[in-house]
Amino acid sequence: MVGNEKFVASSEMSIHSNAIILNEKYKGIEDVYQAYGRGSFKIDLGCGYVKPPGFIGIDNLSGEASQIPNVQNAPDILMNLDEAAFPFPDNSCEEVRSSHFLEHSQLMHILNESYRVLRPGGTFLFAVPYANSAEGMYPGHVQFLTEKWFYENLTFQKNFKIEHEEYFPSADYLKLPFFLRMLIPFKFARTFLFNACWQMIIRCSVKK
């Protein structure tokens, strides 16, 4: 259902796989399109309360952002991101981004839906904790990701082209004496040593 229900505590929400609940400032999904621009909008998946300006913020019905209704910068849409289709037409979206969300998700569903809604040449940008790190091992994660997964998954490679990668050294790695960091370059350390890299950001273009 696509409705104009107000945000309410998650215990009162239907978590039917197709349920979509809009922020109370919208009467229907058309209002979301009007607010952000049909055919040129951007989506932030798993946005919580920190979605960037200009992005349609979407979060899970069971996520943290569904617990407190109508706070400032609340998501525009709550839905079951792991099962339901995104409420947007094919080839309609300029950019899909997520920050520390994919590791909590049913990854292939998210990737397939992101590919579907992105228009040709659209951008898919994501940040995830590096699997081989303390952040990557947090309880609640269901995906444990490094760049290796994205380079070796055939479906991802078919649908997306990796344009840029950035890796963030952990505080522990940066505390190593300079000569050790020269002996153990970061690229080697992030692959073979635990907790050398804590996060990666990858920017892709969609292949259509």
Give, region by region, the residue ranges found by the protein language model.
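A structural signal for well-ordered alpha-helical scaffolds and beta->alpha junctions
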Residues: 22-29, 42, 143-147, 197
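Conserved SAM-binding loop
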Residues: 36, 40-132, 204
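Residue-level marker of positions within ordered structural domains that often coincide
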Residues: 1, 50, 155
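A general structural signal for short secondary-structure junctions and capping/turn motifs
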Residues: 34-35, 48, 192-195
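Class I SAM-dependent methyltransferase Rossmann-like catalytic core
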Residues: 2-35
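Compositionally biased regions
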Residues: 11-15, 115, 206
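A short linear-motif detector with a strong N-terminal bias
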Residues: 20-23, 33-38, 74, 104, ...
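S-adenosyl-L-methionine-dependent methyltransferase catalytic module, highlighting the catalytic core
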Residues: 106-113, 123-208
